[in-house]
Amino acid sequence: VGFKAGVKDYRLNYYTPDYQTKETDILAAFRMTPQPGVPPEEAGAAVAAESSTGTWTTVWTDGLTSLDRYKGRCYDLEAVPGEENQYIAYVAYPLDLFEEGSVTNLFTSIVGNVFGFKALRALRLEDLRIPPAYSKTFQGPPHGIQVERDKLNKYGRPLLGCTIKPKLGLSAKNYGRAVYECLRGGLDFTKDDENVNSQPFMRWRDRFLFVAEALYKSQAETGEIKGHYLNATAGTCEEMLKRAEFARELGAPIVMHDYLTGGFTANTTLAHYCRDNGLLLHIHRAMHAVIDRQKNHGMHFRVLAKALRLSGGDHIHAGTVVGKLEGERQVTLGFVDLLRDDYIEKDRSRGIYFTQDWVSLPGVLPVASGGIHVWHXPALTEIFGDDSVLQFGGGTLGHPWGNAPGAVANRVALEACVQARNEGRDLAREGNEVIREATK
């Protein structure tokens, strides 16, 4: 009784412009490009329906639950200025649609099948508001910024890193030697490249051993705590944990994971292991551009960054603003703040669609990496501030005198920039002069 079969417009149930969002709702901002002839209200409602409780037709089992309680709602639409037939659709999802502590489940719903939907030419998730009621169900980063500084005993400046190159092809012994040279020269960290896992020319266990030797030797010589991001990414979760465990047994302070290729389930598993065992966790974002590079389809990196803060990681690559990889300055700074700060106000000029309150979830250090070198140090110090990791790969190893002098050059330049900034000098204007003085 009361059930009427047939296909209905989504907007009859899922477009609700008078809906008042709740504190506990997960809010999403989608950039939609509807197919010609599809009204934006229908497209927005379709997104809300297909990413929550809806399907293409009315089904009798709808009567067995309270759809009003569980459905996603498109509660606002705005045309994108300067773009033809593009709209921002705001969708509110009730909290009960999602499993607690699972980024995997969150993404399966919100960025699942709906992205292949016929009524849309393109769809991009621009931002998500994660309410405290949901974020409190996650452990988040294993340690966070303050605990990391305390573990490393390094304060008042950005941390320095370097990716060992050539990224593939070195033997474990030569790899360890390159690590030692860089750390001895003054870097805080060296890094496995994201595609170094356990290949025929260098098996993971051999690499871990020679790197541990380099760590202990450079620590003894410099009196500073040193780290190398040992990449634990593997084909199975069990193998990944085996590698992390061996790193812990060797006394290494930090391991690494490729969180998008490894997957959120594996990443969250590793983040829990790292907190339980006192390891820091460095996150690389290989594959992100497949998802975030198109301006009208996919997902913005700020969403992937928020997802990582929930899933867990102490460092994450965040572009550079100045190097070889793409990144717009204000927008990059927007998601850098979303990674580090506890409370971030809505600010559309920086691409932040919602005010985000992380409550007590620890912060993540943004890593600037990709085509940067010594002459970028003033700009990077100014843009990223102290709570960041600056990673010069070719910018260290490409030094004409070798790795250790390259590392010395980076450390000297960084300390000169930090000192000049602390003395009130204008790095944007005087940066090159500051570095020239430091080299004398």
UniProtKB/Swiss-Prot annotation:
The disulfide bond which can form in the large chain dimeric partners within the hexadecamer appears to be associated with oxidative stress and protein turnover. Its cofactor is Mg(2+). Keywords: Calvin cycle, Carbon dioxide fixation, Chloroplast, Disulfide bond, Lyase, Magnesium, Metal-binding, Methylation, Monooxygenase, Oxidoreductase, Photorespiration, Photosynthesis, Plastid. Binds 1 Mg(2+) ion per subunit. The modification N6,N6,N6-trimethyllysine is found at K4. Its EC number is 4.1.1.39. Its main location: plastid. Substrate binds at N113, T163, K167, R285, H317, S369. It catalyses: 2 (2R)-3-phosphoglycerate + 2 H(+) = D-ribulose 1,5-bisphosphate + CO2 + H2O; D-ribulose 1,5-bisphosphate + O2 = 2-phosphoglycolate + (2R)-3-phosphoglycerate + 2 H(+). Mg(2+) binds at K191, D193, E194. GO terms for biological process: photorespiration; reductive pentose-phosphate cycle. It comes from the Eukaryota. One of its GO terms (cellular component) is chloroplast. The basic functional RuBisCO is composed of a large chain homodimer in a 'head-to-tail' conformation. In form I RuBisCO this homodimer is arranged in a barrel-like tetramer with the small subunits forming a tetrameric 'cap' on each end of the 'barrel'. HAMAP family: RuBisCO_L_type1 (MF_01338). This is Ribulose bisphosphate carboxylase large chain.
